[in-house]
Amino acid sequence: MTDLEFMDRAEKLLLAVEQSCDRINDTTDADLDGQRTGGMVTITFRNRSQIVINLQKPLHEIWMAAQSGGYHFRHDGTAWMDTKGAGEFFAALSHNATLQAGEALQFTD
């Protein structure tokens, strides 16, 4: 993948995360605070815990830091997949957000 392709796909992912935060806030009482700064989105939960998602341009990866640990995702041509085989980005984000929020949350692309 070229740098331009990476940036296009990565920007779409970050936008989808922001839009999911808005949708979740509109349809639940989760009260997420999603803040975008450049190539990073920080999601802050009611309990003040956070999930941080950021671009790693030189590696063509998306990194996610959650209470459960750090995750690296690389686009496989179809989806952003964990580099250690732990699954797809939005499934991992939904799982970690659910754990940190204490209620079921669904992030989608």
UniProtKB/Swiss-Prot annotation:
Gene3D superfamilies: Frataxin/CyaY. Signal peptide: none annotated. GO terms for molecular function: ferric iron binding. Keywords: Iron, Metal-binding. SMART domains: Frataxin_Cyay. The keyword S-adenosyl-L-methionine does not apply. Disulfide bonds: none annotated. The keyword Metal-binding applies. Transmembrane segments: none annotated. One of its GO terms (biological process) is iron-sulfur cluster assembly. GO terms for cellular component: cytoplasm. Involved in iron-sulfur (Fe-S) cluster assembly. May act as a regulator of Fe-S biogenesis. Belongs to the frataxin family. HAMAP family: CyaY (MF_00142). This is Iron-sulfur cluster assembly protein CyaY.
